[in-house]
Amino acid sequence: YVGQISRMLESCGAAIAVAPASHMGFLEEVSEQVDLVMTGTPEDFDQLPEKEVEFSPLRPDEPAYLQYTSGSTRFPRGVEIDQSTVLDNLHEIAEHGLKLTHQDRFVSWLPYYHDMGLIGFILVPLICQLSADYLPSRTFAMRPRLWLKIISENRGTISSSPTFGYALCAKRLRPSDYDKYDLSSWRAACVGAEQVNPVPLKAFAENLAPCGFDENAFVACYGMAECVLAVSFAPLDLGLSVDYVDQDLMSTQGLAAPADENSTNTAA
């Protein structure tokens, strides 16, 4: 972890690094390997004396931030996102992908350093002036049912997760939980950031149907850090559409030949 952070800081020429108190030990190790002007917690920076600084308005083609890729196939790369590109993607997500209204409310446990959390659940509700509730990612990993509790109590309408998040919730649910949640408000349960596996998603929908969860709320999404976040959304209110194909033909010839769902040689 320290090695990866060091390489990321070096690759972008960072001068300052900020971390919560819980991660300062890592940052102190990093500072021994990377030449930084200053490191510290947000509270450390708040204590610095203020100075008058004149800011010039940024042009549309100037950088807004660096978004690092997931690093699933190689070392994370910093993608430079300019001002106009991020605003365009935010508009497309709000207007066309999710078709947001003033009645929507976001709920998220996604980490802020990931494009799905940063763009989808911080910047989108921010520019749309919509309410959002946040659950720390670590807390979700330990107590995933809190995610459902927040959606239920605050009448959340938009919430996303990779497939594993839905699978984790379904695994931790008990029959006695069904009376605790009302998920009828959840209209867009986006799925992305990893392979969209229909098996755990169907289990999630079946387990939470007594709580008012509608399987048609599932929205398969595809995104890339290089494109800010969203590349495509499945249509809203239709749920998942799954094609079953012959796995051998797909892997050897690239042919999507229909196959029986229950066959041992089937890929979804």
Regions found by a protein language model. Name each.
Residues 72, 129, 193:
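Conserved G/P- and acidic residue-centered "switch" motifs that form tight phosphate/ATP-binding loops
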Residues 50-68, 74-75, 85, 97-105, ...:
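Conserved pre-ATP/AMP-binding loop-to-beta segment of ANL
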Residues 2, 10-13, 22, 31-40, ...:
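Conserved adenylate-forming
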Residues 87-105, 115-157, 172-176, 235-236:
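Conserved AMP-binding/adenylation subdomain of ANL enzymes
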Residues 16, 56-59, 79, 83, ...:
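Hydrophobic alpha-helical scaffolding
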Residues 63, 69-72, 106, 159, ...:
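Conserved S/T- and glycine-rich ATP-binding loop of Class I adenylate-forming
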